[in-house]
C-alpha cells in the first residue's frame, strides 16, 4: 500500500492509514483501466529498456519494421527465440495476455462519450449516412474487438439490426454474436476485404498500430471494397502534444505511429481515396472520413 501511495494510486494519511483518492475512484468506476495499467507498465517498459541498445547495435536503423521493434530485440537479447520474429500482439497471445488486453479495449482508461455522440459533436452527420439504402450492410467495424462500438451505434439507431452490423476481428470473441454479425478476418494476410460496398468501414485505433507500409496495405484493401457511396471512418487520436507518449509507445511496440492531417491525405491519395471530413480534438479520438477519389466535391470539411 505504501508503494501504491508513492505511485499516487491512493493517498497516504499516516504509516498505517490510506485513503481513496480520485485515481482510486476512477479505477473502480472504469475497471478496464486496471487492465490498461497492467499493459502500459509491462510491454512499453520492456520495449523501452532495449530501445537504445537496438538503435546502437543497428547503427540507428529507423523506422523500425513491425516485427523488428525493441520488443522483439529484447527477446533476442535474452535468447527467447520463440518470440524473436513474432508480432507484439502474437507475443501477447502466446503469453496468454490477450484476454486482459481485450478487457482493456472495452473501456480503455475512460471514454469521451459514445461513438455516435462523439462524431455528432464534431458536426458529422452519421445518421444521414446510415439512412442510405444503397447497401444492406450499414457498418463494417474492422478490428473492433468485441463489438462495443457497433453496440453503441445500434443503441443510437435502433432500426439497425444484426444483419446490418458486421464485426471483423482476428479470432473474434463471440460474446455479442446475438447482436452482431461476426466474421473472422486477419487483415494482415493476403485475403481481401470480403464485404463489398458497405455504407461505412470503421476503424478505431487500428492504423496507429501499423507501420506506414502496413497501414497503406490495409487502406488499399478497404478502398478496393468500397463503392462510390462508401465511407471509411478512422477514429484515432490527434498528433499533438497530448498524445506524444502514445506516439512513442506505438513506435516501440508495433513500428506504428499517430498521424497528422497531412499524413492522412498522403496515404489516402496513394489508396485512391480522398479526405472529406476531419476533426482533431485536443483530447479523445478524432475523426477522419475518406471516400473514393472523385466521388465528393473535392473539398474537405474540417471541424472547428
Provide a role label for each language-model segment.
Residues 5, 259, 283-285:
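Eukaryote-biased feature marking scaffold/signaling PDZ-domain proteins and nuclear chromatin regulators
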Residues 5-6, 56, 269:
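Alpha-helix C-terminal capping/helix-coil junction sites
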Residues 5-17:
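A short, conserved structural fragment
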Residues 14-37:
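Short, cationic-aromatic polyanion-contact patches
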Residues 30-234, 238-243, 275-276, 280-281:
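Conserved adenosyl
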Residues 231-271, 275-279:
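C-terminal alpha-helical "lid/dimerization" subdomain adjacent to the S-adenosyl-L-methionine
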Residues 272-304:
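Core SAM-dependent methyltransferase catalytic element
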Amino acid at each position: 500500500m505504501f508503494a501504491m501511495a508513492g505511485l499516487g494510486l491512493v493517498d497516504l494519511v499516516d504509516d498505517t492509514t490510506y485513503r481513496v483518492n480520485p485515481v482510486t475512484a476512477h479505477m473502480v468506476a472504469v475497471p478496464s483501466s486496471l487492465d490498461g495499467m497492467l499493459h502500459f507498465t509491462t510491454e512499453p517498459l520492456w520495449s523501452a529498456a532495449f530501445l537504445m541498445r537496438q538503435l546502437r547495435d543497428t547503427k540507428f536503423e529507423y523506422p523500425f519494421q513491425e516485427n523488428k521493434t525493441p520488443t522483439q530485440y529484447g527477446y533476442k537479447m535474452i535468447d527467447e527465440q520463440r518470440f524473436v520474429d513474432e508480432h507484439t500482439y502474437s507475443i501477447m497471445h502466446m503469453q496468454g495476455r490477450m484476454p486482459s488486453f481485450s478487457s482493456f479495449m472495452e473501456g480503455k482508461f475512460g471514454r469521451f462519450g459514445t461513438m455516435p455522440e462523439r462524431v455528432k459533436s464534431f458536426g458529422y452527420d452519421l445518421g444521414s449516412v446510415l439512412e442510405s439504402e444503397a447497401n444492406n450492410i450499414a457498418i463494417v467495424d474492422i478490428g473492433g474487438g468485441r463489438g462495443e462500438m457497433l453496440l453503441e451505434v445500434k443503441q443510437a439507431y435502433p432500426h439497425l439490426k444484426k444483419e446490418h452490423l458486421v464485426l471483423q476481428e482476428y479470432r473474434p470473441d463471440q460474446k455479442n454474436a446475438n447482436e452482431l454479425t461476426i466474421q473472422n478476418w486477419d487483415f494482415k494476410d493476403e485475403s481481401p476485404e470480403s464485404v463489398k460496398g458497405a455504407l461505412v468501414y470503421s476503424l478505431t485505433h487500428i492504423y496507429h498500430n501499423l507501420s506506414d507500409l502496413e497501414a497503406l496495405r490495409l487502406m488499399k484493401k478497404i478502398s478496393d471494397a468500397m463503392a462510390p457511396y462508401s465511407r471509411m471512418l478512422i477514429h484515432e487520436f490527434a498528433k499533438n502534444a497530448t498524445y506524444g507518449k502514445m506516439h512513442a509507445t506505438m513506435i516501440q511496440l508495433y513500428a506504428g505511429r499517430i498521424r497528422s492531417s497531412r499524413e492522412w491525405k498522403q496515404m489516402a491519395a496513394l489508396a485512391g481515396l480522398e479526405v472529406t471530413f476531419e476533426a482533431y480534438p485536443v483530447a479523445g479520438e478524432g475523426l477522419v472520413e475518406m471516400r473514393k477519389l472523385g466521388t465528393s466535391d473535392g473539398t474537405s470539411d474540417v471541424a472547428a
